[in-house]
């Protein structure tokens, strides 16, 4: 499947970023953050693994229409990746907080774990995705959205990125 190996690596990086952020913020269970990060893009991974033609079409739509991943996935599949990820995580008996982390509310999340998961996912996307716009400072954009919510600065984010790569 196009990009499956990359998606698995992105899952690991998101998990590592989430755990590092949880440690930095003193959350009681950093491994729960790791698990939430690991499953954040479960729906996309499943589509790439089990429906490679559809996944290739999503990537094609993104390129042809210069649209975002969510819009392209919805156009091709008729539902967002997160719906599939949530359904499978529930089916597998994953904890409710892990399921909630798959479609977290980002900066609006009332739960620190969910905000950290959303930030970790967006950070990973901004830094490592091939389809990220190289002309934009994606890290600055993500940090601007989440800095107040998570009380983070650019230096702390740099430390999170370095620690996660060591892992």
Predicted segments with their positions:
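Metal-dependent nucleotide-binding catalytic modules
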Residues: 1-8, 12, 16-19, 23-32, ...
């Amino acid at each position: 499947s196009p990009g499956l190996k990359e998606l698995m690596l992105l899952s690991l990086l998101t998990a590592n970023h989430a755990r590092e952020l949880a440690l930095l913020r003193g959350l009681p269970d950093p491994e729960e953050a790791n698990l939430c990060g690991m499953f954040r893009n479960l729906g996309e991974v499943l589509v790439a693994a089990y429906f490679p033609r559809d996944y290739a079409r999503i990537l094609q739509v993104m390129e042809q229409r210069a649209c975002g991943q969510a819009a392209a996935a919805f156009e091709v599949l008729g539902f967002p990746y997160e719906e599939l990820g949530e359904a499978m995580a529930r089916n597998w008996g994953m904890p409710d907080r892990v399921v909630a982390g798959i479609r977290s509310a980002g900066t609006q999340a009332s739960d620190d774990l969910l905000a950290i998961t959303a930030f970790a996912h967006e950070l990973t996307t901004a830094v490592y995705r091939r389809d990220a716009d190289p002309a934009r400072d994606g890290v600055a954009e993500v940090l601007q959205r989440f800095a107040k919510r998570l009380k983070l600065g650019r230096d702390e984010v740099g430390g999170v990125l370095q620690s996660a790569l060591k892992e």
